[in-house]
């Protein structure tokens, strides 16, 4: 009846568990001998409390800029969007802001500027290229060809005496549309024969005087 009321007798616990040192297992037992039902369990090692807010602790602290610092950074950004390390160091000395934070500020400012401009429109027409300038040497042959076209047909060059001979044709009419003009007026009454006779007489008279 006692066994049915109180259950089966408890099994004997091992003297020394394999995973626990004997000193800690036997600590606090009655009489310091053997582990029995009255043996006090060893206190468990306390774990460190879980760190609350670990991601927020690892997050970098946000830098707050004053109005004067923002004005200085904006002036430099209007001048150059990609400052080098030397310019960032000078800005760090002037604004008392770490150089790494200045570099991050310029990265964010460039991204903001691209968002404000928006993507380029694909259908926007490109500006036409400027017209090519013609060199003066290229215009000279064109002007020369125009002058030759105006004087067409060109006048034929001949010996000086050809201007005195009339062109052949019916009724003594000139053959071309541009008859040559005589170099000097012809003497009336056959002046050529009279001049030749007078010259011969003068020459004969001078020869006889010798």
Curated annotation (Swiss-Prot):
Stretches with biased composition (Basic and acidic residues): 144-153
DNA-binding region range list: 58-117
SUPFAM superfamilies, per database record: Homeodomain-like
Compositional bias (Basic residues): 109-118
GO MF: DNA-binding transcription factor activity, RNA polymerase II-specific; RNA polymerase II cis-regulatory region sequence-specific DNA binding
Compositional bias segments (type: Gly residues): 29-38
Main location: nucleus
Residue ranges with Low complexity bias: 39-57
Coiled coil: none
CDD domains, sorted: homeodomain
This protein's UniProt keywords: Developmental protein, Differentiation, DNA-binding, Homeobox, Nucleus, Transcription, Transcription regulation
Compositional bias annotation for Pro residues: 7-21, 119-134, 176-185
A Gene Ontology term for the protein's cellular component: nucleus
One GO BP: cell differentiation
Residue segments, region Disordered: 1-63, 105-194
Subcellular localization: Nucleus
Organism in which the protein naturally occurs: Gallus gallus
The keyword Manganese belongs to this UniProt entry's keyword annotation: no
Protein name, as recorded: Homeobox protein MIXL1
Keyword Disulfide bond attached: no
UniProt record similarity statement: Belongs to the paired homeobox family.
Job description of the protein: Transcription factor that play a central role in proper axial mesendoderm morphogenesis and endoderm formation. Required for efficient differentiation of cells from the primitive streak stage to blood.
């Amino acid at each position: 009846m006692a066994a049915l009321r109180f259950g089966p007798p408890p099994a004997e616990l091992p003297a020394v568990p394999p995973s626990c040192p004997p000193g800690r297992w036997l600590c606090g037992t009655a009489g310091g001998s053997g582990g029995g039902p009255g043996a006090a369990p060893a206190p468990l090692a306390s774990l460190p409390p879980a760190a609350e807010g670990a991601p927020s602790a690892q997050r970098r602290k946000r830098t707050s800029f004053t109005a004067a610092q923002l004005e200085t950074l904006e002036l430099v950004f209007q001048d150059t969007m990609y400052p080098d390390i030397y310019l960032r160091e000078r800005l760090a000395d002037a604004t008392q802001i770490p150089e790494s934070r200045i570099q991050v500020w310029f990265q964010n400012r460039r991204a903001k500027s691209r968002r404000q401009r928006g993507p380029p429109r694909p259908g926007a027409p490109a500006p036409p290229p400027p017209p090519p300038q013609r060199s003066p040497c290229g215009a000279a042959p064109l002007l020369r060809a125009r002058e030759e076209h105006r004087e067409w047909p060109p006048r034929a060059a001949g010996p000086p005496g050809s201007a005195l001979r009339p062109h052949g044709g019916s009724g003594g009419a000139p053959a071309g549309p541009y008859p040559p003009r005589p170099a000097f007026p012809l003497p009336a009454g056959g002046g050529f024969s009279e001049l030749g006779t007078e010259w011969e007489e003068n020459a004969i008279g001078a020869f006889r005087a010798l």
